[in-house]
A protein has these predicted regions:
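Preference for protein termini
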Residues: 1-553
Length: 553
């Protein structure tokens, strides 16, 4: 919801004589009812409404944040430059929140504590060839793109894997789920949205947005003559995502054992991936220099790489760039959706990379391990048969999920319920980046029209009832909007898939992506989200605010 005035100020009266904050909050509540309250969304801590005194202060903070963003490199090439060519000559701050989103401290701690178990789960999944082939046997009937990935994985397995070491960079995405039916009138729980491996957008911007928000809150404290009382129990968590993930890549490069070999980053050269180039190229080179290594990081789109790489098939299966540069590590963020494979040349290049002895981040087995069917009953137990505590820790973050490849009564019932009540479910394909997710009436229509074979490429997931935060979104002028925040927890792992030995397993930081509560697709690559950060509050404070907001609505 757009607004042309400041936010909550107890002594600020508008021209009609009504307190401006009361008028603004009332309009937001009306908008909330229209935009999603019927889906079970619940409004939470409204600290933003308490910390801005008037419109002049809001505009000052907006310009202050923009200026500071430029000073710390929180910028990205604009998507529509004046000359029509995407270039880093024209740079502006990306879509960012002016203030950090409130989030329950207990749920954040839960997400951090489960991350190393999540890393190991997907390492074990990616190392189980038979499981992957079985998991995708129905998917490939209705998804030709994933069928090509499965075909490559089978080819590499049958030929013999030439590089047992593998790198997993993971981002596990969560929301704070509101369950109104729980004892005591409702409670919050951490629920997983999805897991991404390899193309994990956000780590480059995540740290700088946290830095910007700290600066804005410091400026507010100066304006207030001290920290506002409503922020007394808040805490901004430390975020070193860029450095930690770069460390995992640097260590992987070192493990290859050739100091002259290059690190090849496959990445599209557009604005949404600019921050990934920042942390890969600059941070890895910086780490190498500190350790006495000269790491040559080269960035290419998959299409360009397909014309310049070659494989030594008669020797040790080394991968070369331009015939002379041996490749130690390939970090793959390009080639995750069909549009990034316009010709057979891209498929040939990806196959060549998978057959090589270069260490991959990730290899194709990790790409397949992101099947959303891992949440189905019995799957986690398969990979941790003797560790019920770890199984329970992981499963505590799952929401309801159903595979659609069967023709049994249970499958028919859940499909019929999703068609009747589409607001309670999400239909997901195996495509990453938020592009294979379907909602509401589009989902219901697809379920009615798909054949059994087509359904096998999808899963149904219970829709999460998120917390909706009142937040300033940086635009010109700034807007006050209802937003839903999704927290991404980063983790990294290096392991030997031939024997299961783990060499590195770490929690690496977090990113927050927020979107308007009335927007379904919120990924940065989809253009619907903005970069955010966290301000942690005790759950009791969040719950008190949530319950009072629910009563008001």
């Amino acid at each position: 919801m757009e607004c042309d005035g400041g936010v909550h100020a107890k002594n600020c009266i508008d021209q009609s004589g009504t307190k401006f904050a009361d008028r603004l909050e009332h309009s937001l509540e009306i908008g909330a009812k229209k935009s999603g309250a019927n889906r079970g969304e619940i409004h939470c801590n409204k600290y933003v409404l308490e910390v801005i005194s008037d419109n002049d202060q809001l505009r000052m903070l907006e310009q202050y944040a923009i200026d500071y963003a430029h000073s710390i490199g929180l910028v990205s090439p604009i998507s529509d430059p004046p000359d029509g060519k995407l270039t880093n000559i024209y740079a502006v701050p990306p879509p960012i929140a002016l203030f950090p989103s409130p989030f329950p401290r207990e749920l954040y701690d839960h997400a951090v504590n489960v991350q190393q178990a999540m890393n190991e789960l997907y390492f074990r999944v990616a190392s189980d060839h038979d499981f992957l082939m079985d998991a995708f046997k129905d998917v490939i009937k209705g998804d030709p793109f994933m069928a090509r990935f499965v075909q490559i994985a089978k080819m590499v397995h049958d030929e013999g894997i030439h590089q047992p070491l593998a790198v997993q960079l993971q981002r596990a995405d969560y929301m704070a789920h509101w369950d109104p039916s729980a004892d005591g009138g409702g409670t919050m729980a951490l629920k997983q949205v999805e897991v991404n491996i390899g193309a994990i957008g956000g780590p480059g911007f995540a740290r700088t947005v946290s830095k910007l928000h700290k600066k804005v809150l410091d400026k507010l404290a100066i304006e207030h003559g001290g920290q506002p009382a409503i922020l007394a129990n808040s805490e901004a968590p430390v975020n070193r995502s860029r450095q930690n993930i770069a460390y995992a890549l640097y260590q992987s490069w070192k493990l290859f054992g050739d100091p002259k070999a290059v690190l090849l980053c496959l990445s599209t050269m557009d604005s949404t991936h600019f921050e990934q180039l920042q942390f890969v190229q600059f941070e890895v080179e910086k780490l190498g220099k500190q350790q006495g290594d000269l790491v040559n990081v080269l960035v290419l789109p998959l299409t360009d790489a397909s014309k310049r790489i070659s494989l030594n098939e008669t020797g040790d299966f080394s991968l070369y760039l331009d015939g002379t540069k041996r490749v130690a590590l390939v970090h793959i963020t390009d080639g995750n959706v069909p549009e990034e494979f316009p010709t057979e040349h891209e498929w040939t290049a990806r196959t060549m990379i998978e057959r090589s002895n270069a260490i991959l981040s990730p290899n194709i087995r990790f790409h397949l391990s992101c099947t959303k069917k891992i949440q189905q009953p019995g799957m986690v137990e398969r990979f941790f048969p003797d560790d019920p505590k770890r199984v329970a820790l992981i499963r505590s973050t799952f929401t309801g999920l159903w595979g659609l490849e069967f023709e049994d009564e249970a499958t028919r019932e859940v499909i019929e319920d999703a068609i009747r009540s589409p607001g309670n479910y999400i239909l997901k394909s195996q495509v990453e980046g938020g592009l294979g997710i379907f909602f509401d009436h589009q989902m219901a229509q697809m379920l009615q029209q798909m054949s059994k074979e087509e359904r096998g490429a999808y899963i149904l997931q219970r829709r999460i009832n998120p917390l909706v935060n009142y937040l300033m979104r940086q635009k010109i002028p700034a807007l006050l909007e209802d937003v839903v925040s999704e927290i991404g927890i980063y983790g990294s792992m290096i392991g030997d898939q031939s024997n299961g030995r783990i060499l590195h397993n770490a929690f690496d930081g977090h990113v927050v992506r927020s979107k308007r509560s009335d927007v379904s697709h919120g990924g940065m690559s989809c253009g619907g989200g903005l970069i955010d950060s966290l301000l942690l509050f005790p759950m009791a404070q969040m719950l008190d605010k949530s319950k009072s907001a629910l009563n008001e609505c």
